[in-house]
């Protein structure tokens, strides 16, 4: 389904310093929405076009769906952690989460983007920095 050439990670700034993470009971939808908005703005400044946000499909939710100038659909998982303890934000996208993302993306792709190339990226906010992981995983890896 999704095959795009891997690219090097890109970094930026954008997270307040602190400890712990933003997920679970301590987190909130508004905190998640803030990070998703910041990720969207970061990606738009790098030439990606916004397609959709918080799309619930059979199998899971897609935080952001973007499109590259060449038409590739990019399914973006946004993660935030105050520190890199416990593996950090990017490491929190485990195989179960990847499997749910691929399932949801497949349903979206069939309805809205069939025929387009696609990839899975992660935008991770941690320890005061933003890291963009292009082609973070492949559909056939899960």
Swiss-Prot record:
Q: Where is this region: Disordered?
A: 1-23
A family per Pfam: UPF0102
One MF term in GO for this entry?
Answer: nucleic acid binding
What is the name attached to this protein's record? Answer: UPF0102 protein Bamb_0202
The Swiss-Prot or TrEMBL record describes its family as follows:
Belongs to the UPF0102 family.
Q: Which InterPro entries match?
A: Restrct_endonuc-II-like (IPR011335), tRNA_endonuc-like_dom_sf (IPR011856), UPF0102_YraN-like (IPR003509)
Highest taxon of the source?
A: Bacteria
> What organism is this sequence from?
Burkholderia ambifaria (strain ATCC BAA-244 / DSM 16087 / CCUG 44356 / LMG 19182 / AMMD)
What SUPFAM superfamilies does the entry give?
A: Restriction endonuclease-like
Check the record and name the Gene3D superfamilies matching this protein.
3.40.1350.10
